[in-house]
């Protein structure tokens, strides 16, 4: 569950290292976001001389959460960290690589480019 003020790791090579969630998009009154939800975030830590700078406001997709996700098959999955991938207005990732595993729920939400860049899909 990701809510306002939650810090997330960045799982791509866009130049950002840490994000802070400002708003979860598309959830109505619910203030929590899960895997596959879009968020508005601010970059809190960034690598120098990269396209994404510190204090930039970006759109990202949540790819991993520490909160357990229950699937329809009865299986549950949980990751070691909260992580997101920075995307542009078209929904494509800004980086060219995705680090670490991502959840299968991203494929259902039509983030196939992120799934194809990921080294492992759980």
Curated annotation (Swiss-Prot):
Molecular function (Gene Ontology), one example: large ribosomal subunit rRNA binding
Domain of life of the native organism: Bacteria
Keyword rRNA-binding included in the entry's annotation: yes
UniProt KW keywords: Ribonucleoprotein, Ribosomal protein, RNA-binding, rRNA-binding
PROSITE patterns on file: RIBOSOMAL_L14 (PS00049)
GO CC list: cytosolic large ribosomal subunit
Gene Ontology BP terms: translation
SMART domains reported for this sequence: Ribosomal_L14
Function as written in the Swiss-Prot or TrEMBL entry: Binds to 23S rRNA. Forms part of two intersubunit bridges in the 70S ribosome.
Similarity annotation: Belongs to the universal ribosomal protein uL14 family.
Subunit structure: Part of the 50S ribosomal subunit. Forms a cluster with proteins L3 and L19. In the 70S ribosome, L14 and L19 interact and together make contacts with the 16S rRNA in bridges B5 and B8.
Protein name (Swiss-Prot/TrEMBL): Large ribosomal subunit protein uL14
Species, as recorded: Microcystis aeruginosa (strain NIES-843 / IAM M-2473)
Classification of source organism: Bacteria, Bacillati, Cyanobacteriota, Cyanophyceae, Oscillatoriophycideae
Gene: rplN
């Amino acid at each position: 569950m990701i809510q306002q003020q939650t810090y997330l790791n960045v799982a791509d090579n866009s130049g950002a290292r840490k994000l802070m969630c400002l708003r979860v998009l598309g959830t109505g009154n619910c203030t929590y976001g899960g895997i596959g939800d879009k968020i508005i975030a601010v970059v809190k830590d960034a690598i120098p001389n990269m396209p994404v700078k510190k204090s930039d406001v970006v759109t990202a997709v949540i790819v991993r959460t520490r909160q357990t996700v229950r699937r329809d098959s009865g299986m549950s999955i949980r990751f070691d960290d909260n992580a997101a991938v920075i995307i542009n207005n078209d929904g494509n990732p800004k980086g060219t690589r995705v680090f670490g595993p991502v959840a299968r729920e991203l494929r259902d939400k039509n983030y196939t480019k992120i799934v194809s860049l990921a080294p492992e899909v759980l």
